[in-house]
Amino acid sequence: MADPSSYRPKPGQIPDSPGVYKFRDEHRRVIYVGKAKNLRQRVANYFQDLANLHPRTRTMVTTAASVEWTVVSTEVEALQLEYSWIKEFDPRFNVKYRDDKSYPYLAVTLNEEFPRVQVMRGAKKKGVRYFGPYGHAWAIRETVDLMLRVFPVRTCSAGVFKNAARTGRPCLLGYIGKCSAPCVGRVTPEEHRELAEDFCDFMAGRTGTYIRRLEKDMMQAAEEMEYERAARLRDDAEALKRAMEKSAVVLADATDADLIAVAEDELEAALQIFHVRGGRVRGQRGWVTDKVEAVDTSGLVEHALQQLYGEERGDAVPKEVLVPALPEDPEAVSQWLADRRGSQVSLRIPQRGDKKDLMATVQRNAQQALGLHKTKRASDLTTRSRALEEIAEALGLDTAPLRIECYDISHLQGDDVVASMVVFEDGLARKSEYRRFQIKGFEGQDDVRSMHEVIGRRFKRYLQDKERTGEWEEAPEAAPGSASVHASATGPAATGQATAGPAAMGQAAAGPVSTGPAATGPVPAPELTAASPDDEPEPREDDGRPKRFAYPPQLVVVDGGQPQVAAARRALDELGIDDIAVCGLAKRLEEVWLPDDDDPVVLPRSSEGLYLLQRVRDEAHRFAITYQRAKRAKRIRSSPLDDVTGLGETRKQALIKHFGSVKKLRQATIDEICEVPGIGRRTAESVVAALATTAPAAPAVNTATGEIIEEDDGGSS
């Protein structure tokens, strides 16, 4: 009996998307298949206390040895894939799955004089149009109920139909407008068949025509002031849109295709293949490979095709192969595939429709597989230790860098320049010690100068904290620094400390900080902005909490090449810190730059050390660009009312709504502002004072005519 905790996925590995999951035993046989609207929540239920599980579920999870999952776009897709896998694998723990019947289809009996829409199971009949399969019969009934508003096709049995024809009275659906009542002659057989064919066309995917027609009729009815009819047409269009979601199918019934997707970074690539037969996903394959050579997506696709079909013949090679990028010589590859199949094979990139949507699902699975692989690789203790040792050896460090800090600069064409600092301890991200910086020492775009400023500010604070905690017996008084924010982190795994002496501290506290060769004078260190948006008061000397920058790294990594590395090293030298190593990662990840070296250090692509440096660099880039975008968005949405103390978002919106714009609010008197509900006189005076100190925006001018365009100066806040 296996222990479920031995194969339980780690927190965060399972996505919260719809999907299908499989439990396998120790012999890799599938023993259970299930579907979920939220994979993370559903799969987690299997790994609770065994005593709380149903006896059959308890037996299943103790028999299993692994669990796998596949992400899909919608719950309908999950139902279809679940059905395919249950039929394919016949899992032993699915014997009581639903009612053990074949899955239901939505059928239209076009072989009858008055076609009927109904739920059908079992063998297909000639002259009947089928749509599905569906997971439940009620799902079909919900779809049909929505569509009968627009396509009132017959749904009754033959007995009910004949009885209504004999009595001359239709059934209830005929009275409420969900059946055209051909039984009593309200429509002719030809008109009813046309309704049935329109119903089939919509279910087959030709949806846009009908929705556009309804919306056009709705607008026309509204113009003619027939509002009740317009409202019904609006509801009909909404019903069709909801039906589209409920009746989604993977692909057309006759489709045989393989869909291949690739997710990649500079070092690795994940491939996912969905095998579609008869319009349904019959199987899935995937693997992750190291990019041992410089290869693009086209090359990865070509390698995948060779491995997939190199030993296949006949129908094992499908009629259609859909890929994210064509090989370098698509004609030759297509001919190679055709030779193996014995007939023509279409190799192409899907551009629209259901195939493009399904390709997006395959792509999501590839991304998920790559992310899961990276998570497993990063969390392995042996792998992390080897990565740190490889970095130490490549950079000539005495010990493994147990604490690594990485810095990245982000801006948009020189505006909103920010920087990020991320921390990795023992090869794992320590997010509680991430920090963000605003570059305020100069204007414009200069990544090298920005890097120098950030490194100088960070380690100046480190020296100040070191003096404040009394680690030096003798040190000059530190100059007032920027406000400090309490950090919730504990001490680092690293044990080494910088050994800069009092002289260095004096330079850091009082002396000028150079910003590069072009600097002509002292540049005051601007305030530091931490991950928290607001600075907090200085902590007490004896509060026992770790300070924000109290722990030095053994290695500083900067995003960039030789210029950025030189700037970081110069900033450390100016502070008298000489025992912290510095390196930089150029855009080509195999190049690691060191200070004063003319040539980069080249690590093998398969190196765990290079892999760790890449993760550190990517995390710093992500953190920086997220902050930069948030800062830019805040600036764009800013309003003069933001500076009014005590004026919250609700009352700001009330002011704008009352006056229409900031421009009109600026022209209002205090008494007029007090008329707004919730605004007192003191607040009104603060609003007037704030707007008086803020100059109105310059008018917009049409550059072609010189005309001034009247615009309100900011309706948002």
UniProtKB/Swiss-Prot annotation:
Domain GIY-YIG residues, every copy: 16-95
- Annotated region (Disordered) at 467-548
Entry GO CC: cytoplasm; excinuclease repair complex
A biological process term (GO) from this entry: nucleotide-excision repair
Biased segments, Low complexity type: 477-522
Q: Which Gene3D superfamilies match?
A: 5' to 3' exonuclease, C-terminal subdomain (1.10.150.20), GIY-YIG endonuclease (3.40.1440.10), UVR domain (4.10.860.10), UvrC, RNAse H endonuclease domain (3.30.420.340)
Q: SUPFAM superfamilies recorded for this chain?
A: C-terminal UvrC-binding domain of UvrB, GIY-YIG endonuclease, RuvA domain 2-like
PANTHER family for the chain: UVRABC SYSTEM PROTEIN C (PTHR30562:SF1), UVRC/OXIDOREDUCTASE (PTHR30562)
Q: What is this protein called?
A: UvrABC system protein C
Native organism: Streptomyces griseus subsp. griseus (strain JCM 4626 / CBS 651.72 / NBRC 13350 / KCC S-0626 / ISP 5235)
Lineage of this protein's species? Answer: Bacteria, Bacillati, Actinomycetota, Actinomycetes, Kitasatosporales
